[in-house]
Amino acid sequence: MSSNEKIFSVLRAPRVSEKTARLQEISNQYVFEVSNEATKADVKAAVEQLFDVKVKAVNVVNVKGKSKSFRNRAGNRGNWRKAYVRLVDGQSIDVTAKA
């Protein structure tokens, strides 16, 4: 697996919401949806390499999938993993930029 494939297998998507926007402004923290197998070290390396920034800290949260019903049948959404990435002061990432 090449380094680009490794990066994109670790980082799935940025999470954009009012809460994440507030975190960006107040504490220079960005939130990403990451692979379930990704470690903090993997996330840190991927963000530093992809966005060319210096990461100060990474916190990871496992989010449990919700129970939902569809046409009177019970089902579950999948579990997923969320990473809070704090950057060194003075650096930023444009997560809204289009590829």
Swiss-Prot record:
GO terms for cellular component: ribonucleoprotein complex; ribosome. Keywords: Ribonucleoprotein, Ribosomal protein, RNA-binding, rRNA-binding. GO terms for biological process: translation. Transmembrane segments: none annotated. One of its GO terms (molecular function) is structural constituent of ribosome. It comes from the Bacteria. Belongs to the universal ribosomal protein uL23 family. Part of the 50S ribosomal subunit. Contacts protein L29, and trigger factor when it is bound to the ribosome. One of the early assembly proteins it binds 23S rRNA. One of the proteins that surrounds the polypeptide exit tunnel on the outside of the ribosome. Forms the main docking site for trigger factor binding to the ribosome. HAMAP family: Ribosomal_uL23_B. This is Large ribosomal subunit protein uL23. It comes from Xanthomonas oryzae pv. oryzae (strain KACC10331 / KXO85). The gene is rplW.
